[in-house]
């Protein structure tokens, strides 16, 4: 599966961010876009259906918050299932894979400079 990962910051400070509209307009199966920078972190929007590869981030924690759909995070020995209005933080150095068995919209918070595909 092809991943569409946009790391450019789409919105400036004091600009309205309509994440719902962006998600509704998305036609890709695995897409994410950096929405804005907040201090030393990035807020990213993802629209996912399918699965990502196993990877880790050596220097950055990663936070996922499900807006709609169902999101699975595979860790060593267990899988965490997230439903709307639920979040989960994967600490740096932890190997993980994300999956979405249906179209799912997720907000992510990551350190600026993160490599979304892993180190």
Predicted regions and their residues:
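Short strand-coil-strand connectors
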Residues: 39, 74-78, 101
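Ligand-binding loop in jelly-roll beta-barrel domains
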Residues: 92-119
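Short, conserved beta-strand element in jelly-roll/cupin
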Residues: 47-49, 57-74, 109
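A short, N-terminal "cap"/entry segment at the start of jelly-roll beta-barrel domains
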Residues: 1-44
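Conserved short histidine dyad/triad with adjacent acidic residue
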Residues: 28-29, 42-58
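Short acidic-glycine-tyrosine-enriched beta hairpin
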Residues: 76-92
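A cytosolic small-molecule/anion-sensing beta-strand core signal
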Residues: 39, 67-68, 83-84, 102, ...
């Amino acid at each position: 599966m092809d991943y569409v990962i946009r790391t450019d910051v789409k919105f400036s400070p004091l600009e309205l961010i309509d994440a719902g509209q962006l998600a509704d307009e998305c036609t890709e199966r695995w897409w994410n876009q950096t929405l804005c920078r907040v201090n030393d972190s990035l807020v990213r929007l993802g629209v996912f259906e399918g699965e990502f590869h196993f990877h880790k981030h050596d220097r950055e924690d990663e936070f996922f918050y499900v807006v709609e759909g169902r999101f699975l995070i595979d860790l060593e020995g267990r899988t965490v299932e997230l439903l709307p209005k639920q979040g989960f933080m994967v600490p740096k150095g932890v190997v993980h894979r994300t999956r979405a068995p249906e179209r799912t919209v997720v907000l992510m918070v990551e350190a600026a400079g993160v490599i979304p595909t892993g180190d």
